Amino acid sequence: MKFIKRCFLAALALALVSSCELTELDLQDNPNRVSPENANVDDLYNAIQLNVQDLIEDAWYATGSMARMVANINSYNYSNAFTPEALNDLWNEAYAQIFPDVDALVALAEPRGQDIHAGTAKILRAYVMMILVDMFGDVPNSEALQGTDIISPAADPGSVVYADAIALLDEAIAQLSGTDAVAPSYDNFYGGDAAKWVTLAKTLKLRAYVTTRLVDSNAPSEVAALLAEGDLIDEASEDFQFNYGSNRLVPDSRHPLYDNHYEAGDGDYVGNYFMWLLRAEKLDANGNPVVDPRVRYYFYRQVESSVDGSINDYSCHFSNFPTQEDQPAHYADIDPRLPYCVAASDGYWGRDHLNAEGIPPDGNLRSRYGLYPAAGQFDDNSFQTTQRLGTTGGGGAGIEPLMLSSFVDFLRAEAALTMGTGEDARALLESGIRKSMAKVISFGDLVPNTFAREVDIRGEIATVEELYKPTDKDIDDYVALVISNYDATDDQLDVVMKAYLIALWGNGIEAYNMYRRTGKPNNMAPALEPNNEDFVSTFFLPAEHVNLNQNVTQKAHTVRVFWAEGGPDVY
C-alpha cells in the first residue's frame, strides 16, 4: 500500500518542486493542493500526522547510520553511501503531501474556528521544515507550492527556512493559547490537548536555538527566555511521540522497525558501536565493563555467542573471524577498545560502519531491534530467531520517539555547558538518564508473559522479571558511574552527549544533528576503511528534485548545513 501511495506521490511531486513540460497547460490552481470544498478537515489532519510519521521513517536509515545506530553497508566511502534516489520518498512526503495538506487544512479550518486543527498542523509543518534543512541544507520554501506559477522553485537559505519555521511556531502558539476550539476527532500525538501542543512548539523552538547556537548570536538569549517561561517538555505525559498499533494486515499499523526484524526478512544490521556503548564501553574502578540497564530492551540477541560462528557467517573485511586482535589500526587511534566485526562476544552481532562486504547467511544470527522503541522482543536469554511472521514480542505497538522529556534535559545540559544558561548541567544529565530509563523500562508492560516466564537457573526457579528487569540499585549504580565520569573529566560535554546519544535510540535525526553540532562522542567509531572521504555533512538532494527542477544542481555531500558552519570536523 505504501509503495502504491508513493508512486502516486512521485507523480504529484513533479509539478510541485520540479520543472517539466507542463507550461502549456492552463492550470490556475496547484494540482497538488486539495481544494477546501472537497476536503474533510479531520481526514486531512489524520493524513498529515500519518505522513509526518512516514517522513520520519524514511529518514531513519540515512540519519541513523550516520549516527552509528544502524550499520551503513552501501559503500566503503561516504561519497557512495547514499544515492540521490535514496531520499526521493522523504522529499515527496514533505512537498507532495504534508505541506499541501497543511495549507488545505488551514484554509478549511480557520474560517470555521477550528484553531486546534490549524495550529497543530502548523507546528508539524514547522517541524518538517527544520528536518528538511537539517538533512539537505538549502531547500525550497518561499517559492514552493505555487503550482504552475512557479514550477521550478529556487531554494531558500537554510537559515531563512529555520527562521520561517520559528515564526510559524510562534503563530501556532498564539493560535492555540487559551483556545476553546473543538479538538480533532483523532490526534495520535496529544489527543487534541492544545496546551501540550503549545509546550511542544516552545520545545521545538528550544531545539532550533540549541541547534543554531554556533551561528546565531541571539540563540543564548532566546534559550534563556524559553527556560524562564518554563513551558517545555519535562515529563513523560508531554512526550512528542508517534504511537503505533499491533495490527499486522490492512493496514499494518506496527512500528516499521518491528516489520524490519520480525517478519521474514533479514532486515538492518544494528551498528556495532552503538551496541558496544551500552554493553561494554563503560568500565568500573576495576576495569570491568558496566552494562547499561537498557541494553536488554534496546536489542534482542538471537545467539548466545557472536564469536563462535563458522567462516561463512562473517564479513569482517580485515579477517575471517571477529578477533579483536585484527582491529584496524585507525580504530585504535581513536579508542583501542572500539569493537571490530561484532559489538561484544556474548551475542551482540552487528556490523561496522561503512562495511560493504557481501551479506553472509546471518539473518538468524544478527542482533535485532528490541522491545524499545519498536515493541520487539525483550532479551530474556532465550536466544531464538525473530523471523516468525510478526508473532512475537510486543507486536510492534511501539513508538517513534520524536522529542521526549529526556531529550529535552540533554538539550538543556548542552545549552548550560555551551551557552552559559546558568542551569545545572550535571543535574540535567542525571535527570535525562533517569527519565530515559523509566521510559524504556515501562515497555515491559507490553510483554507481561515474557516477564512472568519462569526459568530454571542451576536448579533455582526465577521469573524473567526477577532475573533481568533492572532494579533501582542497577539504575542508581549506572547513574553514579556516569556522574563520576562527568566529574572526573575536563570534557563534560562528551559525557553528556554520549548519554544523549544512547537515550536517542530510535531517533536518527536528532542523533545526526547532535553529532554534527558537537562532534561528540569523542570515540565515535570511524569508517571501516582508513583514509575515508569526508563525512556526509548533508545528504544529496533527491534525484527527482534535481532532475526536474531547472533551478537546481546537485550539491556535494560535504556541504555543511548552515548551523554547522565553523563547527567541529566529524568523521
Predicted regions and their residues:
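Bacterial N-terminal signal peptides that target proteins for export
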Residues: 1-8
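Short, compositionally biased low-complexity segments
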Residues: 20-27, 70-78, 134-143, 459-474
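Membrane-proximal, proline-rich intrinsically disordered regions
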Residues: 20-68, 74-77, 85, 89, ...
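Short coil/turn segments at secondary-structure boundaries
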Residues: 60-64, 299-301, 508-517
